[in-house]
From Swiss-Prot:
Gene Ontology MF terms: ATP binding; tetraacyldisaccharide 4'-kinase activity
Keyword NAD belongs to the record: no
Name of the protein: Tetraacyldisaccharide 4'-kinase
EC class: transferase
Lipid metabolism listed as a keyword: yes
Pathway(s): Glycolipid biosynthesis; lipid IV(A) biosynthesis; lipid IV(A) from (3R)-3-hydroxytetradecanoyl-[acyl-carrier-protein] and UDP-N-acetyl-alpha-D-glucosamine: step 6/6
Record-listed ATP binding positions: 55-62
Protein's organism: Blochmanniella pennsylvanica (strain BPEN)
Alphabetized HAMAP family for the sequence: LpxK (MF_00409)
Catalysed reactions listed for this entry: a lipid A disaccharide + ATP = a lipid IVA + ADP + H(+)
Coiled-coil intervals, chain numbering: none
Entry's EC annotation: 2.7.1.130
Alphabetical list of InterPro entries matching this protein: LpxK (IPR003758), P-loop_NTPase (IPR027417)
Gene name of the encoded protein: lpxK
Length: 337
């Protein structure tokens, strides 16, 4: 319902405007309370980069985190990642993800990052606690925060904002009348605006990132096959914008028998998923969904492995920005407050 109000012409947003104004006042007061030193901002001895967004929902933050982690690892830097661990529930924070961790505790996106990259990932609602936990565990050159643009208690050196190149900012209103966590003018203060999707809708000065499916992977066995390997597919997606996943499958020649959408961060059960397919049908999902199903996966369950592609010039510029900050920290005598 909210998507129709936010991203399509609908007068219903007018009824929600008073609540949006209240949200805007609270959001603004929260930000300036840190900017003017009324509340403590936590700083650390390594650079922090935030990869976040201005709107609610999935715009591609986690794929961009994966892209950056993998590039920095290849260049020899020691990288850590922190996350709020949205929808994860635990009695003990911070959590440093390990072989015994479950997505129900730490969240699906942190688990995906850990499984895909192997770097240290810490989860806590208080991101400064997650940073401190990582630095106690090992020496790092940089820490990347998956989301957290509005978490001003954590000092950040670099901010990248991910934008859906098609949906953009909808009607531009604060929550709940619109999708905005902060106003669009916040983009003037970030170091990079990265548009996820197609060149259609991209604005001047923005970096284009595109997600390409590389292979399908069996959740139970880890077997990898080319995209065209699967037939009789039932596709599911519990992400911010499931239709984008289904559209991508069709564009690569995978035409699902059925396409089933779930809410973002949906919690699956074995009984629920087995009921979705008949004999000789394949259940195909996103990698983010797959990390929640590993413990009870069946041999006909597969996920799509995707990778971010960014052109060489923008890749060079983004990595130079980050590496220059790492070198600055290594060359300075930085005092932790």
């Amino acid at each position: 319902m909210f998507d129709r109000i936010w991203f399509k012409s609908s007068f219903f947003y007018l009824f929600l405007l008073p609540f949006s104004w209240l949200y805007g006042v609270i959001s603004t007061l929260n930000r300036i309370s840190y900017q003017y030193g009324w509340r403590k901002v936590y700083r650390f001895s390594v650079p922090i980069i935030i990869i976040g967004n201005l709107t609610i929902g999935g715009n591609g933050k986690t794929p961009m985190v994966l892209w950056l982690v993998e590039h920095l690892k290849r260049r020899g830097w020691k990288v850590g990642v922190i996350s709020r661990g949205y929808k994860g529930k635990s009695n003990n924070y911070p959590i440093i993800i390990n072989m015994n961790s479950h997505s129900e505790e730490c969240g699906d996106e942190p688990m995906l990052i850990w499984k895909r990259t192997g770097v240290s990932v810490a989860v806590s609602p208080k991101r400064a606690d997650a940073v401190a936990a990582l630095l106690r565990k090992q020496e790092l050159d940089i820490i990347i925060s998956d989301d957290g643009l509005q978490h001003y208690a954590l000092f950040r050196d670099i901010e990248w904002v991910i934008v859906n190149s098609v949906l953009r900012f909808g009607n531009g209103c604060w929550l709940p009348a619109g999708p905005m966590r902060e106003r669009i003018n916040r983009l003037h203060t970030v170091q990079a605006i990265i548009a996820n999707g197609s060149e259609v809708g991209i604005q001047s000065g923005e970096v284009l990132m595109q997600l390409f499916p590389i292979a399908v992977v069996n959740i139970l066995t880890g077997e990898r096959k080319p995209l065209y390997f699967l037939n009789n597919v039932v596709a599911i997606a519990g992400i911010g914008y499931p239709t984008q996943f289904f559209d991508t499958l069709r564009s690569y020649g995978i035409i699902p028998i059925r396409s089933i959408s779930f809410s973002d961060h949906h919690v699956y059960s074995e009984k629920m998923l087995t009921s979705l397919t008949k004999k000789d049908e394949i259940l195909l999902m996103t990698e983010k969904d797959a990390v929640k199903c590993i413990d009870f996966a069946h041999d006909n369950w597969w996920y799509v492995h995707t990778e971010v592609k960014i052109n060489k010039i923008d890749t060079h510029n983004l990595l130079s920005m980050v590496e220059n900050k790492i070198r600055y920290y290594k060359g300075s005598r930085y005092n932790v407050q």
